[in-house]
Amino acid sequence: MFARLPLYLRLVRMDKPIGSLLLLWPTLNALWIASDGHPSVSLLVIFALGTILMRSAGCAINDYADRDFDRYVKRTENRPITSGKIKAWEAVALAAGLSLVAFLLILPLNALTKELSVAALFVAGTYPFTKRFFAIPQAYLGIAFGFGIPMAFAAVQNQVPLLAWVMLIANVFWSVAYDTEYAMVDRDDDIKIGIRTSALTFGRFDVLAIMLCYAVTLGIYVGIGFTLGFGVLYWIGLAAAAGCAVYHYTLIKGRERMPCFAAFRHNNWLGGALFAGIAAHYAAQAF
């Protein structure tokens, strides 16, 4: 068992934390806004651990769903299931176990949060299969990656206000942006194996679509900033996030594989800048 631990860690991408961070930033945004900048330590721990666990479970299910495709993609041909080092049933069992632990984490929370967690599990578990028939599965991914937003509001306020759903919509557009960059890396392989991605759907308008998605995401947060009366520190963070998006354009405009992958990874800084602006605003209010 312990000898196989490195394989399981690879399966759930513990060596690639960028995915967990892309889930964590929007969740932290929601926790800070829902609590007026004063989230409890217990909620921070629950949501941080839950994010990592559910992202890991999602990776295991993704590799299970894509096991017959990954062998034809250069970037994924050596993944544990595809290479035969881990059996398919092991991935399913691991995903189920991680999901159970994540659910146990939220047992102390209110009923609404638990109900939303069921919907979150369904979306996360079905996302990998949408690549077979959805033209833009990245939008579905955005819902899965953003479900921590309504759950955070539910945990803090015992309700999910309109603001939470607006933030979820922003997350969908952000996810389409960064995961299209990711899909551009595998474009040629995805064409051969017949998987649908936003990079293929957008075609020659892929770069334009990505930048429009960034614009919508940031535009929504402009509206949130005005609505909530955020101060200058928030706007500095938002400006930094916008700067990241502009930098991504310089990386993806040539549609080369490695720069596109670098742009995807750099979204951690975009998300971090936005959260820093939100956290700084509330911190300044405390003085």
Curated annotation (Swiss-Prot):
Q: What is its main location?
A: membrane
Keywords for the protein's UniProt record, in alphabetical order: Cell inner membrane, Cell membrane, Magnesium, Membrane, Transferase, Transmembrane, Transmembrane helix, Ubiquinone biosynthesis
Give GO cellular component annotations, separated by semicolons: plasma membrane
Tell me the Pfam families matching this sequence.
UbiA
The protein's superkingdom reads Bacteria
Give the metabolic or biological pathway.
Cofactor biosynthesis; ubiquinone biosynthesis
Compartment annotation: Cell inner membrane
A GO BP annotation:
ubiquinone biosynthetic process
Please give the start and end residues of each transmembrane region. Answer: 41-61, 92-112, 133-153, 160-180, 197-217, 267-287
One GO MF term: 4-hydroxybenzoate polyprenyltransferase activity
Q: Which reaction equations make up its catalytic activity?
A: all-trans-octaprenyl diphosphate + 4-hydroxybenzoate = 4-hydroxy-3-(all-trans-octaprenyl)benzoate + diphosphate
Q: What is its EC number?
A: 2.5.1.39
Q: Which InterPro entries match?
A: HB_polyprenyltransferase-like (IPR006370), Prenyltransferase (IPR039653), UbiA_prenyltransferase (IPR000537), UbiA_prenylTrfase_CS (IPR030470), UbiA_sf (IPR044878)
Q: How does it sit in the membrane?
A: Multi-pass membrane protein
* Cofactor(s) needed for function: Mg(2+)
Q: Which family does it belong to?
A: Belongs to the UbiA prenyltransferase family.
Function recorded in the entry = Catalyzes the prenylation of para-hydroxybenzoate (PHB) with an all-trans polyprenyl group. Mediates the second step in the final reaction sequence of ubiquinone-8 (UQ-8) biosynthesis, which is the condensation of the polyisoprenoid side chain with PHB, generating the first membrane-bound Q intermediate 3-octaprenyl-4-hydroxybenzoate.
This protein is called what? 4-hydroxybenzoate octaprenyltransferase
